[in-house]
Each structure stands twice: as structure tokens, then as C-alpha cells.
Design a protein with these regions (language model features):
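Core catalytic region of metal-dependent phosphoesterases/phosphodiesterases
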Residues: 3, 10-15, 26-116
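Short, basic, glycine/proline-bearing loop/turn elements
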Residues: 15-23, 55-60, 174-181
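Residue-level marker for buried hydrophobic side chains located in beta-strands
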Residues: 16-18, 46-48, 122, 206
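Active-site glycine-centered loops adjacent to acidic/histidine catalytic or metal-binding residues
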Residues: 21, 50-51, 89, 125, ...
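Conserved beta-sheet core of the metallophosphoesterase superfamily
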Residues: 104-109, 122, 127, 131-141, ...
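Non-catalytic terminal accessory segments
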Residues: 108, 117, 171-203, 212-213, ...
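Binuclear metal-dependent phosphoesterase catalytic core
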Residues: 114-117, 218, 223-288
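Active-site-proximal loop/helix segment associated with metal-binding centers of metalloenzymes
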Residues: 124-189
Length: 288
């Protein structure tokens, strides 16, 4: 593999990288780890597949510097020539009003049909299959807040386990695995996505939303399709990468990544307001 060197930093080249369910603005978001991951790669195309910003949670005024640095990192990637496609999800659905917008290297869409090396890829967040989002949004938001606190508690538990030399655990996964309805929902989600993809002649269907990273073949009586889910940056810290004709599911904890995050960022905004001003300047520069 030929590595890309920029300003004394060696980055790993990636043809396509996909991340989803980052949930910036929540306590559970692993923003520092995501910043490190994004800094380590030089993708031709970065697809952000929904729930990058958790607009539902922004009202609580929690948006630390580590979260603003992730946004700043994406802006830097745009400036360096990476094409970024932002696919909207249910937690950032307010951005759907901008679907179809193209501004420099940034595109906002609700779904993406992509041909990669002759294979048809159908990429979307996945909340379209979630009935609770469409009919009981207040209940979904309440559940999201409970999930946020569960993840925060899980972090404290894993910190103690690390001090004891024990392996980390996922409390939310244990809860989901113990609830038959949750297991059935994941199975139905995957099956529905696969059936629609097969009916439309797609080779791959790629989703996020359910925080279940996986790559597998799903077969029906009408054919088969490759189902991929990029996972999340709350529990699993996972993403998808396409290189050399194949997809890989990457796990942050399996990567050997430098822990120095910010020496290549010119400035670090100290508030979301300062970040908004920086984004506005970036967009004005692109328009000019």
C-alpha cells in the first residue's frame, strides 16, 4: 500500500470510507477516537451515513471541544480535496431540507446510489424502516436520552474494568441481546433492506442506524445481496473502508493510530458558536 504524506504526516489511502451514528453532542460520542481515525486516513470519498450530529440532544448545551474538532477535521478534509457525502439520518433530520445541495466537495443527500468497480451500491441511513421514528417521535427521543445515560454509565464501568485488567463490556448490547423484540427488530431491519436491494438489482446495501456493525450475504428466493452496516462511534467505534476491490469492517481498537490529534489543525474553536463562524467562512471561501 502506498501511503500519502502531508505536512510530515503519513496517512493511509482509502478509496471510500463510511462512518455513521457518531452522535456529536451526546455524552456517549467517542469524538477523540473518531478525530484520530479521520486524521489517519486519506480517503477519496468520505460518506457520513446519518446521525453525525445529534440535533435532538443539542438543546442540553453539551458540545465539548473534542466534538468541535471532529467537525473541524471534516472541514480540513474537504479543503484537502476529499469528497464528502453527508447522508441524513433521524437524529439530524433537520438537514433533510438541504438534500440535493452541492457546495464544493460537500454533497448532502438522503440516500446514495453509487457504482464502485461495476457494482451497484445502495447507501442510506436506515431510519426509514423504523416505525417508532415516524409515529412516536417523542418516545424515540425519550429512549435516546436513556440510551445516552446508559452509554455514559457503561464508560465508567469499562474504566473500572480496565483498572482491574478485565475486558470491556457493552451494557447496551447485553440489554438488546436479552430483549427478544430488539433482536427481532435488527433481524427484520436487515432482511427488509436486503429484500428491497435484491428487488432493485443492487449488489450491496449499506446502512447505519441500528449500531450493529456487520458484513454478510443475505439470500432470499429472489437472489442475494451483500449487506453492510458501518456501526457507530458510541459503542463499537467502527466504520467501513473500500480498497483494492473489497470492503473491510474496521474497528478503531484494532488500528495502530498515533494519539496526537491536533497538531495539524490551525485553530481549535472553544465553542459551537465559534465553530459556526468558522464553517461560514469556509463556505463563503468555497462560493467565492
Amino acid at each position: 500500500m502506498n501511503f500519502v504524506k502531508t505536512k510530515n504526516m503519513v496517512k493511509r489511502p482509502v478509496k471510500v470510507a463510511i462512518i455513521s451514528d457518531v452522535h456529536l453532542g451526546t455524552y456517549g460520542c467517542h469524538a477523540e477516537e473518531l478525530n484520530l481515525y479521520l486524521k489517519s486516513i486519506a480517503p477519496e470519498l468520505l460518506i457520513i451515513n446519518g446521525d453525525f450530529l445529534d440535533i435532538w440532544q443539542l438543546s442540553k448545551s453539551y458540545f465539548p471541544a473534542s466534538h468541535t474538532r471532529v467537525l473541524q477535521r471534516v472541514m480540513k478534509m474537504l479543503s484537502n480535496g476529499t469528497k464528502v457525502v453527508y447522508l441524513t439520518g433521524n437524529h439530524d433530520e433537520l438537514l433533510r431540507r438541504y438534500s440535493g445541495m452541492e457546495l464544493g466537495n460537500l454533497t448532502v443527500e438522503d440516500k446514495l446510489l453509487l457504482d464502485i468497480d461495476g457494482k451497484k451500491h445502495w447507501i442510506f441511513h436506515g431510519d426509514v424502516f423504523d416505525v417508532s421514528m415516524k409515529h412516536s417521535k417523542w418516545l424515540a427521543k425519550l429512549g435516546g436520552q436513556g440510551y445516552d445515560f446508559l452509554i455514559l454509565f457503561n464508560r465508567a464501568v469499562n474504566h473500572l474494568l480496565k483498572l482491574m485488567g478485565r475486558e470491556r463490556i457493552s451494557l447496551s448490547k447485553k440489554v438488546k441481546d436479552s430483549v427478544k423484540g430488539a433482536v427481532k427488530f435488527v433481524s427484520n431491519f436487515e432482511q427488509t433492506a436486503a429484500e428491497i436491494a435484491i428487488d432493485n438489482g443492487y449488489d450491496y446495501v449499506i446502512c447505519g442506524h441500528i449500531h450493529e456493525p456487520i458484513m454478510k450475504t443475505i439470500t432470499t428466493d429472489k437472489g442475494s445481496v451483500q449487506y453492510l452496516n458501518s456501526g457507530d462511534w458510541v459503542e463499537n467505534l467502527t466504520g467501513l473502508e473500500y480498497n483494492d476491490g473489497k470492503w473491510s469492517l474496521i474497528h478503531y481498537h484494532d488500528l495502530n493510530i498515533s494519539q496526537n490529534t491536533d497538531e495539524d489543525l490551525n485553530t481549535t474553536p472553544t465553542s459551537i458558536i465559534q465553530l459556526q463562524e468558522q464553517i461560514n467562512r469556509h463556505l463563503l471561501t468555497k462560493v467565492a
